[in-house]
């Protein structure tokens, strides 16, 4: 395909137009009085959201240069969302401010690479200041306040705080759609995985369709179990011990399954057979996790063990096991605490060394099952559109709360950025590097100004006022009052704040050092009658 090339100012201004088109749509959502954006869907109901990354993903521009500019800013929002789970709109606003201020300096003839170094050094100094001023999240109320701000709903914040209190920092909190109105929290103590009983005949409670085993032995097998003769020696030992048996294997089939079902129906022996979760290497790893949690051993040819020779000492134990048709929950496994802690440390190390987002996600799930628990927040709403929007807000708020616990919190409302400006006062930079640092200085006020603008206040006057207030004090845009923001519960996780700044600065530096843009030449479309007008809005100065 033929290419079109733009150089110098034309290239940069084309990218800026794309950035402004996207940023102007996203930034109206910032702050407690921000608006929503409606996203059309080709099928089904439209989505109403105030989530920056969701809006950014939907924007596709026609002009090739503008499209590239918008795509670069999408990366800012996406990366911030991936790292911190929130702050996508703030990152977009910062990127727009950095690029706008930077291009003014480009027009004045500043050296691009010098500016870039200045921006990087300034961001490093501001990040250090943010981390230094962060306060640890110590109370349930602080978690509730932080999550509540992210979700725009105090009740959601309180529910997330309760969930984190129950399952711990490493615990899994999932959000599901509910058919009932309102919010519900379900807690699972122990390990749960998404595999249920192989046969419905194993159910001990026909009404609830679940099998409950009290104080069972747990047999873990790394292969298929098909013949009775392999299983019989071990079964006899378990029957003599007078305990029920949970079998977790790659599969249980044929006469082995038939024998277990018949014994259950006759009432001579209570057991449940379940397929092991996952597949391939992940199945082996999860079986090993269950073995450590329950104090058992995976019976596998790889470790020289077979069912025929296995003794009862190789079986795991738990206080209770509940199995439904879809999932298995092991409560209070009998594994050694030190062995479990060692396994947790091993998984954490694997997470840190993993380059794959998918692998990290699966490792995080394994870590949570061993180290914490599982909390399920069920969200309901009056309409499908409202339900989707609410579920998304809760998911963002959960990640926001975890980020707060991880690195601490700083004053929200854009105040932390503005009050970090003094970190640049002691800089000994000259020339274009000093210009780059000044670009960051100017841009740091942009989030607060946008929050003020969305709240119907005068941005410039407010920014000047807040910059002279004591650290941590600023405008609460919800109440229009000046107060100690941390004490008032207006806080942002420092992980979200620093990630937004770092990612915005990274893309801005690329914008400002661009000298040419190569894009696909638009194909000529066949003439069609006009159906309306298109309006465009550029960057807004304060």
Curated annotation (Swiss-Prot):
Compartments where located: Cytoplasm
Residues involved in ATP binding: 29-32, 86-90, 413, 492
InterPro entries, per database record: Chaperonin_Cpn60_CS, Cpn60/GroEL, Cpn60/GroEL/TCP-1, GroEL-like_apical_dom_sf, GROEL-like_equatorial_sf, TCP-1-like_intermed_sf
Class of the enzyme per the UniProt entry, highest EC level: isomerase
GO cellular component, one term: cytoplasm
Keywords: ATP-binding, Chaperone, Cytoplasm, Isomerase, Nucleotide-binding
Reactions catalysed according to its record: ATP + H2O + a folded polypeptide = ADP + phosphate + an unfolded polypeptide
Family: Belongs to the chaperonin (HSP60) family.
Assembly behavior: Forms a cylinder of 14 subunits composed of two heptameric rings stacked back-to-back. Interacts with the co-chaperonin GroES.
Protein purpose: Together with its co-chaperonin GroES, plays an essential role in assisting protein folding. The GroEL-GroES system forms a nano-cage that allows encapsulation of the non-native substrate proteins and provides a physical environment optimized to promote and accelerate protein folding.
HAMAP family in the cross-refs: CH60
Protein name per UniProt: Chaperonin GroEL
Originating species: Nocardia asteroides
Gene designation per UniProt: groEL
């Amino acid at each position: 395909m033929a290419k079109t090339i733009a150089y110098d100012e034309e290239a940069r201004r084309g990218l800026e137009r794309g950035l402004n088109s996207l940023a102007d749509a996203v930034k109206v959502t910032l702050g407690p009085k921000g608006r929503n954006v409606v996203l059309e869907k080709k099928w089904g109901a439209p989505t109403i959201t105030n989530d920056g990354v969701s809006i950014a993903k939907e924007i596709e521009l026609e002009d090739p240069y503008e499209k590239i500019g918008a795509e670069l800013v999408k990366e800012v929002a996406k990366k911030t969302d991936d790292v911190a789970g929130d702050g996508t709109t703030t990152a977009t606003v910062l990127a727009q401010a950095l690029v706008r201020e930077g291009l003014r300096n480009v027009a004045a003839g500043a050296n691009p690479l010098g500016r870039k170094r200045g921006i990087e050094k300034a961001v490093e100094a501001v990040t250090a200041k943010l981390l230094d001023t962060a306060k640890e999240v110590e109370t349930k109320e602080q978690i509730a306040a932080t999550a509540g701000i992210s979700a725009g709903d105090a009740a959601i914040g309180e529910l997330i705080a309760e969930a984190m209190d129950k399952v711990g920092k490493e615990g899994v909190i999932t959000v599901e759609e509910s058919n009932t109105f309102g919010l519900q929290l379900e807690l699972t103590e122990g390990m749960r995985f998404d595999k249920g009983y192989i046969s419905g005949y194993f159910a001990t409670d026909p009404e609830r369709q679940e099998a409950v085993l009290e104080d069972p032995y747990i047999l873990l097998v790394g292969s298929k179990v098909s013949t009775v003769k392999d299983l019989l020696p071990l079964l006899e030992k378990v029957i003599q011990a007078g305990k029920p048996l949970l079998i977790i294997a790659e599969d249980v089939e044929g006469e082995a399954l038939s024998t277990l079902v018949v014994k259950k129906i006759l009432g001579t022996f209570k057991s449940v057979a379940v397929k092991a979760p996952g597949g391939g290497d992940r199945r082996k790893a999860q079986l090993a996790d269950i073995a450590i949690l329950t104090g058992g051993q995976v019976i596998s040819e790889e470790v020289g063990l077979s069912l025929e020779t296995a003794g009862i000492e190789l079986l795991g134990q738990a206080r209770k096991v509940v199995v439904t048709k879809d999932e298995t929950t092991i409560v209070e496994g009998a594994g050694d605490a030190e062995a479990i802690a060692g396994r947790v440390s091993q998984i954490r190390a694997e997470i840190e060394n993993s380059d794959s987002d998918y692998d990290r996600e699966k490792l995080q799930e394994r870590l949570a099952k061993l180290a914490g628990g599982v909390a399920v927040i069920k969200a309901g709403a009056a309409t499908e559109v409202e339900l989707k929007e609410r579920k998304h807000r809760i998911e963002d708020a959960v990640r926001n709360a975890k980020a707060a616990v991880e690195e601490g919190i700083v004053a929200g409302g854009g105040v932390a950025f503005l009050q970090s400006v003094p970190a640049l006062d002691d800089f000994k930079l000259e020339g274009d590097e000093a210009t780059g640092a000044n670009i960051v200085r100017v841009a740091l006020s942009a989030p607060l100004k946008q929050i003020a603008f969305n709240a119907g206040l005068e941005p410039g006057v407010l920014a000047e006022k807040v910059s002279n207030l004591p650290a941590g004090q600023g405008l609460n845009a919800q109440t229009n009052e000046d107060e100690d923001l941390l004490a008032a519960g207006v806080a942002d996780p420092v992980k979200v704040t620093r990630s937004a700044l770092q990612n915005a600065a990274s893309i801005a530096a690329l914008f400002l050092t661009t000298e040419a843009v190569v894009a696909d030449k638009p194909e000529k479309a066949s003439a069609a009658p006009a159906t309306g007008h298109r309006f465009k809005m550029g960057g807004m100065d304060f």
